[in-house]
Amino acid sequence: MHQVRTLPTEFSSDGETLRGHFVLPLGEGPFPGIVKFHGIPGSPDQVSGAATLLAQAGFAVLTFDFRGFRDSEGYFTLSGQIDDARAAITHLLESDLTVDTWSGIYAASWGAAVAICALAEDKRIDAVCLRAPVFDTLWFSQLPLVRASAESLRDTDSTQMRGLDDPEIFERTLEKMVEDSRVHNPIHEVSKISPRPLLIVHGTDDIGIPLAGVKRLYELAGEPKDLVVVEGADHNLSDPRAYEITVNTIVEWFKKQWNP
């Protein structure tokens, strides 16, 4: 297996410092760049998995924590994350590690919703891959599951998301999530990704994000687009075979976008 190298990095968004890593191939760059957007809360390890496999395939991958998560400053809001996404794209494109002729986004779950909303207006990205996307932020933000998950995270590991242990911030975070979702909703924005290539990958066993909703998102997207449904894949890719199929699909698709 090819090794990769990681470089710590940080950048600013609305005055908040966001921290992460560049995951890089060995050898001399610059490399084609991809920004990775995590979900809520996303894994504490953003380097392993897809980012490492993409780096092994020749891409420079920028991973980072959105505001309010782990090592980054600030507090979570959807509108803030959209600003973070654009700041991350700027950081990628301004880096000497990346080429200036092509760039991509790989985003999962809630991060996929952020990607769509950011890229509806930001045209600097050339290819977009979404895994298990939250297709409707307003629907999702009002699910009982969201509060239950936030409470569970608060009680088990509040370091993953800032402010959960403050009752006032906790309630305001959930309220603002709904408020922002009335303004920023991928179901209304996904058509604006076209004419940039779009890949959506989803699993048959994802009980949190219904496949029917993902298919609706796909239908609303313009060409060129592809939808890959992975048999046996749940939201967190806990099945090893489904994980392998999913990440290989993503890596091979990005390789084709960089070398059509």
Task: Pin down the residues of each PLM region.
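The serine-hydrolase catalytic nucleophile loop
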Residues: 39-52, 66
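Alpha/beta-hydrolase active-site loop signature
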Residues: 41, 65-70, 135, 234
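Catalytic nucleophile-loop/oxyanion-hole region of alpha/beta-hydrolase
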Residues: 41, 69-101
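Conserved alpha/beta-hydrolase
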Residues: 51-73
